[in-house]
């Protein structure tokens, strides 16, 4: 820009304190393929001793996190499965075919030789209690990740019911925010939870698979932008490629480019990638709603207009370029609501000629009344082809037809019980 006051060129810059996201592949490239590190405190304590300390702490509400981490590590060390094939992620050898691995094969483990912390022990506990005690302790992770009181209450009801199924006189787990709220800020406890979940995600029939009740929130943590894509595919019935064809806003497209950065194993269910945050592989997720606010908002606007409860309750994280993103979402939701993609799955024997006509392309009937009476716009596209719709909108200076706007306003009026600061609340407020 040229300033007429001082007759000089100035460079306009926007202040920002945003930290660039870190892709999981960068961790392994920069670390020469080394595994993430797990540090385990209280190295002098054996399993029977630390089990008694943990059970005593649970009974009295005096749990020591260092004891918990040591206990969960020792239990996980004894949980093994044989691999049917090589397990490799980002070039890291987690295990080879026919190898027995345990929960900690994902880490370089460092056992710390720190001073032993004492506590009140309970002697009425043995290895048979490990199945529910592990569940109870890992459930603190999930409780700590939930900010919703009602959600935590429901989790506790289910958790305590499960625990009582293993041991009738087991202590009740309570909603102690000070405890579970602080535990989830401890990086080693989060790595413990991630290790259990990554292992049980592969070995779903393991005796300890039920502990995922407490650890499942570790998988795809801070990946709401990426997960929104998968959810949108479910709601719309479109493939990811077909969804991308409907993106008419540059900011949304830029977010997709971020998400689709190659080499990050987002399509590998057994990769380190879903656990990159809790395992310390990334300092800032490139897949979060904060890193990709435009695609996240766009997809959940579409989902909400198509009556998805999950999208309705999705957080409203950004208002950047919201008008354009909203108009793009209006078009997509209108088309998906009014133009079905149906297939005749079964045919009577006498109707087989229909299949041949379809293959020959000789049955292309179209609805002649689709365009309506909107003379200013001309005929709206009769198909659900994104290119046709974009050309139509472009030719009309991207002013939405009344038919589209009226449909979306009607859908917005139907939204009820939307929580504050959510996509649903925003749409309900614009009518």
Swiss-Prot record:
Q: Which GO terms describe its molecular function?
A: RNA binding
InterPro entries linked? Rhabdo_ncapsid, Rhabdovirus_ncapsid_C, Rhabdovirus_ncapsid_N, Rhabdovirus_nucleoprotein-like
- Taken from the record, one Pfam family name reads Rhabdo_ncap
Cellular localization per UniProt: Virion; Host cytoplasm
Print the keywords alphabetically.
Capsid protein, Helical capsid protein, Host cytoplasm, Phosphoprotein, Ribonucleoprotein, RNA-binding, Viral nucleoprotein, Virion
Organism domain of life: Viruses
Composition-biased stretches (Acidic residues) = 361-377
| Keyword Ribosomal protein among record annotations | no
Coiled-coil stretches, from where to where?
A: none
User: Quick one: where's region Disordered?
Assistant: 352-379
Query: GO CC terms on record?
Result: helical viral capsid; host cell cytoplasm; ribonucleoprotein complex; viral nucleocapsid
Question: What does this protein's UniProt record list under function?
Answer: Encapsidates the genome, protecting it from nucleases. If expressed without protein P it binds non-specifically RNA and therefore can bind it's own mRNA. Interaction with protein P abolishes any non-specific RNA binding, and prevents phosphorylation. The soluble N-P complex encapsidates specifically the genomic RNA, with protein N protecting the genome like a pearl necklace. The encapsidated genomic RNA is termed the nucleocapsid (NC) and serves as template for viral transcription and replication. Protein N binds protein P in the NC through a different interaction, and can be phosphorylated.
| Assembly | Homomultimerizes to form the nucleocapsid. Binds to viral genomic RNA.
The text of the family note is: Belongs to the ephemerovirus nucleocapsid protein family.
What name does UniProt use for this protein?
A: Nucleoprotein
């Amino acid at each position: 820009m040229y300033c007429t006051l001082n007759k000089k060129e100035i460079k306009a810059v926007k202040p920002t304190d945003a930290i660039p996201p870190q892709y999981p592949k960068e961790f392994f490239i920069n670390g020469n393929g080394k595994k993430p590190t797990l540090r385990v405190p209280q190295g002098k304590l054996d399993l029977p001793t630390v089990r008694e300390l943990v059970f005593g702490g649970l009974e009295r509400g005096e749990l020591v996190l260092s004891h918990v981490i040591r206990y969960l590590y020792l239990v996980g060390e004894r949980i093994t499965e044989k691999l049917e094939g090589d397990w490799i992620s980002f070039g890291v050898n987690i295990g080879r075919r026919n190898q027995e691995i345990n929960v900690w094969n994902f880490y370089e483990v460092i056992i710390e030789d720190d001073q032993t912390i004492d506590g009140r022990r309970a002697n009425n506990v043995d290895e048979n209690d490990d199945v529910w005690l592990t569940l109870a302790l890992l459930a603190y992770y999930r409780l700590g990740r939930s900010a919703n009181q009602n959600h935590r209450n429901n989790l506790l009801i289910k958790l305590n019911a499960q625990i009582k199924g293993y041991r009738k006189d087991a202590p009740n787990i309570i909603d102690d925010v000070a405890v579970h709220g602080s535990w989830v800020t401890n990086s080693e406890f989060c790595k413990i939870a991630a290790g259990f979940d990554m292992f049980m995600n592969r070995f779903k029939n393991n005796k300890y698979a039920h502990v995922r009740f407490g650890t499942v929130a570790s998988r795809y943590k801070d990946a709401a932008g990426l997960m929104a894509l998968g959810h949108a595919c479910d709601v719309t019935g479109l493939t990811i490629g077909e969804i991308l064809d409907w993106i008419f806003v540059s900011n949304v497209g830029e977010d997709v480019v971020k998400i689709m950065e190659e080499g990050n194993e987002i399509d590998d269910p057994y990769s380190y990638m879903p656990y990159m945050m809790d395992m310390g592989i990334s300092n800032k997720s490139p897949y979060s709603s904060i890193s990709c606010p435009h695609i996240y908002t766009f997809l959940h606007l579409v989902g909400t207009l198509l009556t998805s409860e999950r999208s309705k309750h999705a957080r409203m994280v950004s208002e950047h370029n919201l008008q354009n993103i909203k108009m793009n979402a209006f078009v997509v939701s209108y088309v998906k609501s009014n133009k079905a993609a149906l297939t005749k799955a079964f045919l009577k024997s006498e109707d087989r000629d229909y299949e041949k006509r379809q293959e020959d392309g000789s049955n292309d009937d179209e609805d002649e009344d689709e365009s309506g009476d909107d003379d200013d716009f001309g005929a709206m596209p009769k198909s659900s082809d994104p290119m046709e719709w974009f050309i139509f909108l472009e030719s009309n200076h991207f002013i939405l037809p009344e038919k589209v706007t009226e449909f979306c306003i009607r859908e917005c009026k139907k939204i009820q019980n939307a929580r504050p600061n959510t996509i649903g609340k925003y749409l309900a407020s614009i009518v």
